């Protein structure tokens, strides 16, 4: 028994050893077959790639038929065809294989602007073709070439290739999109349908954010206005009131939904009698909410208290059908944002007003410093200076009148009595008369002798000798002193700035530069400039030009007639509005050049 058991146990071990050798032999055979299959696949790939290269070389020839090109599409890839186009362009042949033309006059730029289509094209690829048709035909053929690898096309069927015919049109290149086209309604796949007005309030109430505290106000549809309540303070009373109003609003919506569901199941024969109590209940709830919200407004003005208490009297006795109550809500965050926008608008308005006032004050100071006595003489003539002198002398006489009135009164009394009004000349001395007589006799004798020299001739000779001496010792001309040179530079700067601004003004005023430039130059020559009062910005120079043209109406009838026209007045008014100024501000600046304003020395 023991020997039999041993033999039985040994047999399976022998069989296992034989089975292991067979498995190893089978796996070796499979590995060899797999290697042969991989080698065969590699040979096929290499063969297909070699054939594709041959096709590419064949496409580089001058004469390629249509049938051959259509057959080649199944044996090459898009990359092979791009290599074909590039190689043909290097050989100065058209990139389209069916075109035997040579490439001449190849453009050097990268982009082309088409004036017919108002588009920009990238002509990098277009340079490889002789015409737009060849470029478009080549791109069309390239798009039809299959992108499947060559060694996987055995199970696929060759696609149908269609080549473009002559006259189908061409393409200038790849279009460059400078701007994106706006999205139209047709581009949207599933547009949202418009929600009826009757369902908008219900949807907004159901989808509202529970965490937002709403500040509500009750208005009447009859007035077509919405009055937003002021933002309440963050205290316990306002928060409780907001939470209370929000909870009441949710309960009201839930109650309405429940009533609608019940009404859909059971008939309502007494509809009019049930609507009235519900409306009264809603009005009472809204009234209680408003009373809680208005507790924080006790410190406001009397007018605001009156407006806040007005809704109570309006809704205290609601009548069904006569008054439609609408509840308008806005979150506290939105109310704070709206309040910030209003503050920013007010600040911007205040800042613009301050800037305008600063501009006017700066120009006013500059005009006062510019104006001189020569300016007034140029504008109003030399009579202005004499009139000012007479007025000054008269004022001085009036001041001295208080001191000299007694002396003048005494002189008047003496003249009335016949006394001398002035002291007589003194009586000449006898010795002086005798000497003068001797001198006259001596001059008469010398005159008859021919040696007389009159004093007038002596004085004339002395003057000529003095002039000759001065001419002989005259200094050479010297350049301007620094102060004068700076003044000339400042005048030139002002004239350039004014000329630049006048070019934009004379057109709307129906004038030309030749009509005003001479008067402007003459007026600028009379100004007194410094290194600070000629520094202005472009809008300021334009306003200065308008002021000077208004001032020059005193000397130029053409300017006076032009500025008095309706179109000129409208243009100047619009210009002042753009600068946030008024017409009276321009008038006040012009008045600075009137004689009534004293000249700064």
Curated annotation (Swiss-Prot):
GO terms for cellular component: cytoplasm; nucleus; transcription preinitiation complex. Its EC number is 3.1.3.16. Residues 9-20 have a biased composition (Basic residues). One of its GO terms (biological process) is snRNA transcription. InterPro entries: Rtr1/RPAP2, Rtr1/RPAP2_dom, Rtr1/RPAP2_sf. It comes from the Eukaryota. It catalyses: O-phospho-L-seryl-[protein] + H2O = L-seryl-[protein] + phosphate; O-phospho-L-threonyl-[protein] + H2O = L-threonyl-[protein] + phosphate. Residues 297-313 have a biased composition (Polar residues). A zinc finger (RTR1-type) spans 71-154. It is found in: Cytoplasm; Nucleus. Gene3D superfamilies: 1.25.40.820. Zn(2+) binds at residues 94, 99, 130, 134. Its main location: cytoplasm. One of its GO terms (molecular function) is zinc ion binding. Belongs to the RPAP2 family. This is Putative RNA polymerase II subunit B1 CTD phosphatase rpap2.
């Amino acid at each position: 028994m023991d020997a039999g058991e041993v033999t039985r146990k040994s047999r399976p071990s022998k069989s296992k050893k034989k089975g292991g050798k067979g498995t190893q032999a089978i796996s070796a055979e499979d590995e060899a077959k797999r290697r042969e299959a991989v080698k065969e696949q590699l040979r096929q790939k290499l063969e297909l790639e070699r054939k594709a290269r041959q096709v590419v070389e064949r496409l580089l020839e001058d004469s390629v038929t249509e049938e051959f090109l259509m057959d080649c599409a199944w044996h090459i890839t898009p990359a092979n065809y791009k290599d074909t186009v590039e190689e043909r362009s290097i050989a100065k042949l058209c990139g389209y294989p069916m075109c035997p033309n040579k490439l001449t006059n190849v453009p050097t730029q990268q982009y082309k602007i088409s004036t017919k289509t108002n588009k920009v094209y990238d002509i990098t690829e277009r340079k490889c073709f002789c015409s737009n048709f060849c470029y478009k035909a080549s791109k069309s053929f390239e798009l039809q070439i299959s992108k499947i690898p060559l060694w996987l096309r055995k199970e696929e069927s060759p696609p149908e290739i269609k080549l473009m015919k002559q006259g189908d049109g061409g393409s200038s290149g790849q279009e460059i999109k400078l701007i994106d086209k706006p999205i139209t309604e047709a581009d949207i796949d599933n547009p949202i349908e418009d929600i009826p007005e009757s369902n908008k309030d219900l949807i907004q109430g159901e989808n509202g954010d529970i965490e937002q505290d709403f500040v509500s106000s009750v208005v009447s549809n009859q007035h077509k206005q919405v009055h937003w309540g002021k933002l309440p303070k963050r205290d316990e009373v306002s928060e409780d009131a907001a939470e209370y109003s929000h909870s009441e609003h949710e309960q009201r919506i839930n109650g309405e939904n429940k009533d609608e569901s019940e009404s859909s199941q059971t008939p309502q024969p007494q509809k009019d009698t049930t609507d009235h109590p519900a409306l009264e209940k809603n009005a009472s709830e809204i009234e209680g909410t408003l009373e809680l919200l208005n507790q924080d407004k006790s410190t406001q003005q009397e007018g605001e208290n009156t407006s806040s208490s007005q809704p109570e009297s309006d809704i205290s006795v609601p009548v069904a059908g006569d008054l439609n109550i609408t509840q308008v809500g806005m979150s506290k965050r939105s109310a704070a944002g709206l309040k910030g926008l209003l503050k920013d608008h007010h600040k911007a308005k205040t800042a613009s007003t301050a800037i305008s006032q600063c501009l006017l004050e700066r120009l006013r100071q500059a005009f006062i410093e510019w104006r001189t006595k020569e300016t007034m003489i140029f504008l109003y003539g030399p009579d202005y200076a004499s009139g000012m002198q007479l007025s000054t002398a008269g004022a001085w006489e009036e001041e001295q009148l208080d001191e000299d009135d007694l002396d003048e009164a005494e002189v008047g009394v003496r003249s009335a009595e016949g006394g001398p009004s002035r002291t007589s000349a003194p009586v000449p001395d006898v010795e002086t008369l005798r000497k003068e007589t001797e001198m006259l006799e001596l001059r008469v004798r010398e005159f008859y002798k021919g040696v007389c020299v009159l004093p007038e001739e002596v004085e004339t000779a002395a003057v000529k000798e003095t002039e000759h001496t001065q001419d002989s010792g005259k200094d050479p001309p010297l350049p301007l002193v620094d102060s004068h040179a700076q003044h000339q530079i400042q005048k030139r700067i002002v004239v350039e700035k004014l000329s630049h601004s006048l070019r934009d003004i004379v057109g709307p005023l129906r004038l030309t530069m030749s009509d005003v430039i001479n008067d402007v130059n003459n007026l600028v020559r009379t100004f007194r400039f410094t290194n600070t009062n000629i520094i202005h910005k472009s809008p300021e120079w334009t306003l200065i030009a308008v002021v000077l043209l208004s001032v020059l109406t005193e000397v130029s009838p053409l300017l006076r007639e032009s500025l008095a026209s309706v179109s000129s007045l409208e243009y100047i008014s619009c210009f002042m509005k753009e600068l946030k100024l008024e017409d009276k501000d321009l008038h006040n600046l012009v008045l600075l050049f009137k004689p009534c304003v004293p000249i700064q020395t």
